[in-house]
């Protein structure tokens, strides 16, 4: 699985990205100053390096180099598969979908890794290749991975499944842009991050909020959730919150910080 730590790839892919030639992500040292406490608790990853450490140690460029090398290695391997498909008897009846289960922070928000609900962790590639899609295009509208299965059903001309929570992306692929659409990511019980064409709104299980104007602040640096003029917008965004949240289970060996050691009962009591 690449790119995934440990970031191993053949040397030729590392050679594409000399550390001293790389442009590193932007970083705001006091980026967390306007965040609610719960956001800091969730984002804290004690096992992972911080951006400050990466700067002081001089390792930041090497970390980025390794990540980019793995991305290029994967890109080449995908090309091998697609070339084989094009030269096979199945090219006219095969659908290919490429996606990732999460993004990755490379120091932009103070640390490295995933496990947050900001854009670096929640944004992933999603690529469809199908005989029914004859136009190469890039679509800016945010969608959800829940939409992959309904889209495959649509592309395969199968009857829709009414139990699916997602929706087919075929209309979107055919240029029917929905400017009101919202995509949601949930991390931990009742912590939701949603995005539309202009804003990212985050609503935590204790009622804390973050709001970013992506047109003015695409790097999500300045939390404007406390601006009274945006209360109506936040109320409208909250209408998209899931009505059901599955209780989480404790005891996992993969718990990475104290926040996730709490039980569902403790969460519900905290909200009262």
Region spans (language model):
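Histidine-centered active-site microenvironments of extracellular/periplasmic hydrolases
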Residues: 8-9, 16, 83-134, 144
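Beta-strand elements within well-structured catalytic alpha/beta cores of enzymes
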Residues: 1, 67, 71-74, 78, ...
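Long, internal low-complexity/basic segments
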Residues: 43-62, 70, 74, 224-272
């Amino acid at each position: 699985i690449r790119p995934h730590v440990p970031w191993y790839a053949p040397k030729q892919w590392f050679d594409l990205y000399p550390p001293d030639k790389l442009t590193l992500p932007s970083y705001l040292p006091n980026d967390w100053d306007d965040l609610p406490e719960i956001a800091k608790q969730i984002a804290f990853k004690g096992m992972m390096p911080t951006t400050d450490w990466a700067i002081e140690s001089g390792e930041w460029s090497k970390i980025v180099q390794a990540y980019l090398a793995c991305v290029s290695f994967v890109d080449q391997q995908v090309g091998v598969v697609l070339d084989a498909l094009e030269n096979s008897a199945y090219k006219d009846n095969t659908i290919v979908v490429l996606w990732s289960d999460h993004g990755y922070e490379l120091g932009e928000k103070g640390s490295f890794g995933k496990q947050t609900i900001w854009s670096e962790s929640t944004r992933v590639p999603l690529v469809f290749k199908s005989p029914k899609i004859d136009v190469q295009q890039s679509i800016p509208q945010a969608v959800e991975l829940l939409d992959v299965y309904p889209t495959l059903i649509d592309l395969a001309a199968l009857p829709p499944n009414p139990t699916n929570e997602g929706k087919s992306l075929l209309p979107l692929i055919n240029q029917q842009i929905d400017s009101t659409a919202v995509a949601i990511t949930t991390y931990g019980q009742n912590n939701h991050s949603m995005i539309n064409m202009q804003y990212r709104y985050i609503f935590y299980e204790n009622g804390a909020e973050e709001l970013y104007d992506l047109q003015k602040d695409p790097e999500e640096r300045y939390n404007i959730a406390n601006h009274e003029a945006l209360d109506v917008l936040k109320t409208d965004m909250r209408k998209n919150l899931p009505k059901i949240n599955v209780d989480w289970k404790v005891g996992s060996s993969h718990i990475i910080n104290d926040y996730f050691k709490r039980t569902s009962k403790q969460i519900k009591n905290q909200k009262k």
